[in-house]
Curated annotation (Swiss-Prot):
Keywords on record: Amino-acid biosynthesis, Aromatic amino acid biosynthesis, Lyase, Schiff base
Entry function: Involved in the third step of the chorismate pathway, which leads to the biosynthesis of aromatic amino acids. Catalyzes the cis-dehydration of 3-dehydroquinate (DHQ) and introduces the first double bond of the aromatic ring to yield 3-dehydroshikimate.
Binding residues for 3-dehydroquinate: E46, W47, R48, R82, R212, S231, Q235
Protein's recorded name: 3-dehydroquinate dehydratase
Family classification: Belongs to the type-I 3-dehydroquinase family.
SUPFAM superfamilies attached to this UniProt entry: Aldolase
Subunit annotation: Homodimer.
Pathways involved: Metabolic intermediate biosynthesis; chorismate biosynthesis; chorismate from D-erythrose 4-phosphate and phosphoenolpyruvate: step 3/7
Listed PROSITE patterns: DEHYDROQUINASE_I (PS01028)
A Pfam family: DHquinase_I
Organism of this sequence: Listeria monocytogenes serotype 4a (strain HCC23)
Catalytic reactions on record: 3-dehydroquinate = 3-dehydroshikimate + H2O
Listed GO MF terms: 3-dehydroquinate dehydratase activity
Residues annotated as catalytic: H143 (proton donor/acceptor), K170 (schiff-base intermediate with substrate)
């Protein structure tokens, strides 16, 4: 499997890397969050820009990013606009979604960009090309807040993401039962054994918490923890998350 190196973080080896979302609505709130995150043992910060009140003003988005980057100069930043259809805060046009992501990828100030799989393929490929030209890695994602698809469908989506050029394919699903969590873990194990790229998977809500902890066993390279406000159901406090990941890593 290829390793994916972003600043001082290597995905695809050792314990899953911890990503903590920033969800501030204003520049002041984002600066406060970034200063708090300086004190926390994390690997990646995800800026959930769909929470930002001025997201439709690209100059203000870049200015906010500058403020975050000043406070967190060495921390890998994942730039994510989560669309409303995949559980995000704001519905925007496809045109704006791609303009926002391409513009920010070109700045060279983010390290990774989230690209949702279920968009026009030509647009997805263009954004991946723009990101890679600017040395930005691509997390390609899909989120199902209603259900857990069949194992074959989860595997198929992750393999498709890799085929399109994702550096880190990602899928998050909602379990209705413990069996659904096993389906996600089984799919993760299957893909991680044959994929070229590290993958990121999770089963959400309380039932799925085990999937956020057991990535090193089943093959998920990153997990999401909450420092202030969870951006998805089931996220664990980042300090507790690190403790459990370290415990499992020592035994593995």
């Amino acid at each position: 499997m290829n390793k994916v190196v972003v600043k001082n973080v290597t995905f695809g080896e050792g314990a899953p890397k911890i990503c903590v979302p920033m969800v501030g609505k204003t520049v002041a709130a984002l600066k406060e969050e970034a200063e708090m995150l300086q004190t926390i043992d994390l690997d990646v910060v995800e800026w959930r820009v769909d929470f930002f009140e001025d997201v439709k003003d690209l100059a203000k988005v870049e200015a906010a990013l500058d403020e975050i980057r000043t406070i967190l100069p060495e921390t890998p930043i994942l730039f994510t606009f989560r669309s409303a259809k995949e559980g995000g805060e704001l519905a925007v046009s496809d045109e704006f979604y791609f303009e926002l992501n391409e513009t920010l990828a070109r700045t060279g100030k983010v390290d990774l960009v989230d690209v949702e799989l279920f968009n026009e393929e030509a647009d997805v490929l263009r954004l991946i090309e723009t990101a890679h030209k600017n040395n930005v890695k691509v997390v390609m994602s899909n989120h199902d807040f209603d259900k857990t698809p069949a194992k074959e469908e989860i595997v198929s989506r992750l393999i498709r993401m890799e085929a399109l050029g994702a550096d880190l394919p990602k899928i998050a699903v909602m379990p209705k039962s413990a069996g659904d969590v096993l389906t996600l873990l089984d799919a993760t194990n299957t893909v991680s054994e044959k994929a070229n790229q590290p993958i990121i998977t999770m089963s959400m809500a309380g039932t799925g918490v085990i999937s956020r902890l057991a990535g090193e066993v089943f093959g998920s390279a990153m997990t999401f923890g909450a420092a202030k406000k969870a951006s998805a159901p089931g996220q664990i406090d980042v300090n507790e998350l690190r403790h459990v990941l370290d415990l499992l890593h020592k035994q593995f």
